[in-house]
Amino acid sequence: MTKKKYYISRYIVTFISAGLAAVIPLVFNLMVVMCFLPWGTPIRATGLYPVVTGNVFENVFYNYPLLYVIIYLIYTFVEFGLLSCICLTCVYIEDNWFAVTLTPFILYFSEHVFLTIGLGLKHMSLLGLANMYNVYINNINILIIQLAGLFVVNMLFFLRVRGDVL
């Protein structure tokens, strides 16, 4: 196995395992809730749902709720997969495995505290945007920029790989 294939497989395994660690509890929760509550098309007039006018995929939520759930799970899978792969980049900066393991959480939570408490920008926090019903059409560009930033940080791992010896 070449060094390039090894690091690519390491990245893919980390991405998939983190995405599954985020999505499996959501799927289990959905199945448990479906055992007790009826599944049906949500009615906008009741006002019982967090998806309101201006949310991304609001029409999908009210017309095709299962498709909305699938989109929500894919979004969560990708977001937390990218977030956890930051560990692979930070392994070159820090030698302590415990600190490397905590790096995604520390960055995720400190970004939330800095933006919400420090700057008062609640709509820009990745933690707040993790719930898709908090993503509005007018701030979708903020989410795309943050996900692109996570992707760029993850790609730094592959830049460092070129000079590494297996």
Kindly label every feature range from the protein language model.
Residues L37-V51, I106-K122:
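Juxtamembrane non-transmembrane "cap" segments at the membrane-aqueous interface
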Residues Y11-L88, L127-Q146:
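Secretory targeting signals
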Residues T89, I93, A148-L166:
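Junction motif at the cytosolic side of a transmembrane helix
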Residues A21, P25, N29, V33, ...:
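Structural signal for membrane-spanning alpha-helices in multi-pass inner-membrane proteins
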